[in-house]
UniProtKB/Swiss-Prot annotation:
It is a multi-pass membrane protein. Residues 96-99, 192-195, 255-259, 315-387 are cytoplasmic. Pfam families: PAP2 (PF01569). Its EC number is 3.1.3.-. It is an enzyme of class 3 (hydrolase). The lineage of its organism: Eukaryota, Fungi, Dikarya, Ascomycota, Taphrinomycotina. It comes from the Eukaryota. This is Dihydrosphingosine 1-phosphate phosphatase C823.11. Keywords: Endoplasmic reticulum, Hydrolase, Lipid metabolism, Membrane, Sphingolipid metabolism, Transmembrane, Transmembrane helix.
Length: 411
């Protein structure tokens, strides 16, 4: 389902998304389209929340809570999970890490689809004060809250797992971990309102979406685990086909939004993980948790050091390789219409997070350029292909290459 839009440029002075004149969205979606009608139905509800949200923020605000909620919000970001999840995987928590990674990717993808479909704004600022350590608020729509979706999905899945293990844990450990999970869920979801980043509808919809994803993942956990341990050739084929389908299916936003780029990145990571676990030998994966001994902490430190360096080297190598290879290939195949800019190199640097230049939008996963504003949007252009290669490579290296090295080095 590709949602086409007319080529409507947004003013350069426009800072936040979703607040254009109604004619902008009627031209982009079509005045009689279901998409436009639903947006017009929900928008007044979102706008009416502002006054109450401002009263709540004004009543509770103090410097300590400002710092607390701004920093705890980083626990629901892409950067935190991109750093934490490989480390959990290399520590031997294989299936839990794969479950959480898949949940996080699903949360980013489905919340991004809804955001880009409805193109609804965040709470008005002013009067709301937006408290954030990131500038991403300028480049994302508000409905629903991706932070809340991810917190609810990963938090509730962790709760389900914790409850299933309650009989085998001490009371102190159980209630300590339970408190941490509940604190995490509450801090992220309530913090979105306190920080002025989202309204009640954003958070409540994110909650419903996140809990639904957690229940689905928990119910079909055994199925996914069997897929990751399967040797059937249908696994890598279906993984690639589904990844490309989900990227194609993602709605086209009315304005330049980073949701599509984030979705492409995480769908690609999952594809890389599926391929990596399929190619990986059972010995290399079992070694991750069978190597628990008195030297485990030292060996684990070496694993993390090697793994982080591996990812950094891969990103650097992939960028340079793509800069050298992709543009000539596209030109030789006469696929210049897939190049969103006349200077393909700049576009590839942007897609792979290589540099920041005027006109680019910085994100936690890289930078985007005019990919979205191409007169005739093409989903699989050079920028998209570059992003798929880079991030699927990260997933593949973390689940295949790194465990293979750890086994060979006996660490």
């Amino acid at each position: 389902m590709v949602h086409k839009k007319k080529n409507v440029d947004i003013p350069s002075s426009q800072k936040y998304l979703g607040i254009q004149h109604v004619n902008f969205y009627s031209n982009a979606f079509g005045k009689e389209s279901l998409r436009f009608q639903l947006r017009e139905l929900i928008l007044p509800i979102v706008r009416k929340e502002t006054r109450l949200l401002y009263k709540i923020q004004s009543f509770f605000r103090n410097p300590w809570l400002d710092v607390y909620f701004m920093y705890t919000a980083t626990l629901g970001t892409h950067v935190f999970f991109m750093l934490a999840l490989p480390i959990f995987f290399w520590s031997g928590c294989i299936y839990y890490t794969l479950d959480i990674t898949q949940l996080f990717a699903a949360g980013v993808y489905f919340s991004g689809c809804i955001k880009d479909y409805f193109c609804l704004p965040r709470p008005r600022s002013p009067p709301m004060v937006r408290l954030t350590l990131s500038s991403d608020a300028e480049y994302e729509y508000g409905f629903p809250s991706t932070h809340t979706t991810n917190a609810m999905a990963t938090g509730f899945y962790s709760l389900f797992l914790l409850l299933s293990m309650s009989d085998s844990m001490s009371s102190i450990s159980y209630y300590f971990l339970l408190s941490l999970v509940l604190l995490y869920i509450a801090s992220i979801s309530l913090g979105r309102i306190y920080c002025g980043m989202h309204g009640f509808m954003d958070v409540s919809t994110g909650t419903i979406l996140g809990v639904t994803l957690a229940i689905f993942q928990w119910k079909y956990a055994d199925f996914f685990h069997n897929v990751w341990s399967s040797s059937s050739t249908s696994v890598p084929i279906l993984s690639v086909v589904l990844a490309l389908f989900f990227i194609w299916f993602h709605p086209q936003p009315a304005e330049r939004c980073i949701c599509l780029e984030d979705s492409i990145s995480f769908i690609s990571v999952i594809m890389g993980i599926d391929l990596g676990t399929w190619f990986a030998s059972p010995e290399s994966l079992s070694h991750l948790h069978d190597n628990l001994n008195s030297y485990f902490l030292l060996k684990f430190f070496v694993r993390v050091l090697f793994g982080v360096c591996m990812i950094l080297i891969w990103k650097s190598f992939a960028k340079q390789a793509l800069l050298a290879v992709l543009p000539p290939i596209f030109k030789s195949l006469r696929l210049s219409y897939l190049e969103p800019k006349s200077q393909s190199e700049k576009g590839i640097r942007a897609a792979t997070g290589s540099n920041h230049s005027p006109g680019n939008i910085g994100t936690e996963l890289g930078v985007i350029t005019s990919h979205q504003s191409h007169p005739h949007p093409v989903r699989f252009d050079i920028e998209t292909i570059a992003r798929i290669i880079v991030y699927s490579g990260i997933g593949f290296l973390c689940t295949y290459f790194a465990p293979k090295v750890f086994l060979k080095w006996k660490i």
